[in-house]
């Protein structure tokens, strides 16, 4: 979450240089010369790749999550706990997607940030905040499904709709408190005229931030372990029920639900595991003295892994469709109404010829009726 803090970077005609230092403003706040190391780095290819992928993620994710929100808000009946969680995940995904245009413009502008250190911190923190909100809520979704499927009928309502609302409120409150804390600390520290954002930085004198990032990584792996255990248990129980009720007409739905559960697990693994597996190396390199070659590899790898995490905002709408039968029904109803309205519109336009009014048509229809009476 804090990896987007602005450092001092150096641009030259020979390529992009990034400067690692012991303090963001050591050269301004101390009379001594800061211990800095200039590392040449060519980011033209990386910027092109990031711009392309973030643009695709922005367009697809924006459309998908707006449709998802429309569907969630279109559920007029009482929402269950799963739908409450999914609604909040969609909101978090949209907020993350709204951060992507800033990253896109930054890379298009040859990695030059012109909007100030405060907005850089706001955009970067919002990006990571909403990513971890999604991860936490997906963990609660897996726990909720495990309880509802694996417990007895009397205990299926262990997590009620009201409790899920409380959980979401707590998650958002803690996240917003952390977000405001980061912004306040940035304001107290004071800004500088750096034109760089979203990049690698050393944390030799900022071990507290490194520890905080490490805690987030540990939290992710605990949630990931919870999701794995939950969906494996869910899948086994559903497949066992499907075999027991193989003669019933609806026995196939249990096997389908089990497969969908593993698809959700696969989506989560593809998007978040590579990034968080690499985070241990990334954080360690920030605390230790590393060569310029190693820092360049770490920086570029981290940016690519972050693209995978962002891609989750495109795949979450697919997960919504797989996890909730009500959402599938509403989506089918919306599509049916859309096609029905298009069909009725085309039929109505085909009945009228260009140049004829509705009155002219009614006259031509009535004329044969008068002639038959005359006969």
UniProtKB/Swiss-Prot annotation:
A Pfam family assignment: 7tm_1
Tissue: Highly expressed in glial cells such as astrocytes and microglia.
Principal localisation: membrane
Gene Ontology CC terms: plasma membrane
Disulfide bonds, paired cysteine numbers: 120-197
Extracellular side: 1-54, 103-121, 186-209, 284-303
Gene knockout outcome: GPR34-deficiency mice show no difference in microglial motility but display a significantly reduced phagocytosis activity. In addition, they are more susceptible towards disseminating Cryptococcus neoformans infection with higher pathogen burden in extrapulmonary tissues after pulmonary infection. GPR34-deficient dendritic cells show a commitment to apoptosis, which could result in an altered immune response.
TM helices/strands, residue ranges: 55-75, 82-102, 122-142, 165-185, 210-230, 263-283, 304-324
Glycosylation sites: 21, 29, 35, 193, 288
Expression induction: MAPKs and NF-kappa-B reduce GPR34 mRNA expression independent of TLRs and TLR stimulation also reduced GPR34 mRNA levels.
InterPro entries, per database record: GPCR_Rhodpsn, GPCR_Rhodpsn_7TM, GPR34_7tmA
Topological domain ranges for the Cytoplasmic compartment: 76-81, 143-164, 231-262, 325-375
Keywords from the UniProt entry: Cell membrane, Disulfide bond, G-protein coupled receptor, Glycoprotein, Membrane, Receptor, Transducer, Transmembrane, Transmembrane helix
Highest taxon listed in the record's lineage: Eukaryota
Membrane topology (UniProt): Multi-pass membrane protein
GO molecular function, one term: G protein-coupled receptor activity
Annotated localization: Cell membrane
Family: Belongs to the G-protein coupled receptor 1 family.
Annotated function: G-protein-coupled receptor of lysophosphatidylserine (LysoPS) that plays different roles in immune response. Acts a damage-sensing receptor that triggers tissue repair upon recognition of dying neutrophils. Mechanistically, apoptotic neutrophils release lysophosphatydilserine that are recognized by type 3 innate lymphoid cells (ILC3s) via GPR34, which activates downstream PI3K-AKT and RAS-ERK signaling pathways leading to STAT3 activation and IL-22 production. Plays an important role in microglial function, controlling morphology and phagocytosis.
Protein name per Swiss-Prot or TrEMBL: Probable G-protein coupled receptor 34
